[in-house]
Amino acid sequence: MITKEEVKKIAKLARLKFEEDKVEEFSSRLSSIMDMIDILNEIDCTDVKPLTSVCDMQARMRPDEVTSKDHSNELFDNVQGASQQLAKEVKYFITPKVVE
């Protein structure tokens, strides 16, 4: 059984806020989830092969094709405002400073 104090601790760690009257509800819900997990942990899976996918389909991938075209101008067309031309000249994105 997950206690009200444990629910409050989990909520604090997850930075969740909810009404005090919901603590009892979350306590019973989390306890039932933990009970289901305990049941699953009791199942013997030693001879079961791991499942990697529920469907046996391969992803269709296009072949890689090497091209000599320079796509940088198309890429830098996405830059907004006056810094677009400068970005095309120096070949990198100019962003606001985010670290002191």
Curated annotation (Swiss-Prot):
Which keywords does UniProt give here?
A: ATP-binding, Ligase, Nucleotide-binding, Protein biosynthesis
Query: EC number(s) in its UniProt entry?
Result: 6.3.5.-
GO terms assigned for molecular function: asparaginyl-tRNA synthase (glutamine-hydrolyzing) activity; ATP binding; glutaminyl-tRNA synthase (glutamine-hydrolyzing) activity
> Biological process GO terms, please?
glutaminyl-tRNAGln biosynthesis via transamidation; regulation of translational fidelity; translation
Report the sequence similarity comment from the record.
Belongs to the GatC family.
Assembly information from the UniProt record: Heterotrimer of A, B and C subunits.
Function text:
Allows the formation of correctly charged Asn-tRNA(Asn) or Gln-tRNA(Gln) through the transamidation of misacylated Asp-tRNA(Asn) or Glu-tRNA(Gln) in organisms which lack either or both of asparaginyl-tRNA or glutaminyl-tRNA synthetases. The reaction takes place in the presence of glutamine and ATP through an activated phospho-Asp-tRNA(Asn) or phospho-Glu-tRNA(Gln).
The name under which this protein is listed is Aspartyl/glutamyl-tRNA(Asn/Gln) amidotransferase subunit C
Species of origin: Rickettsia bellii (strain RML369-C)
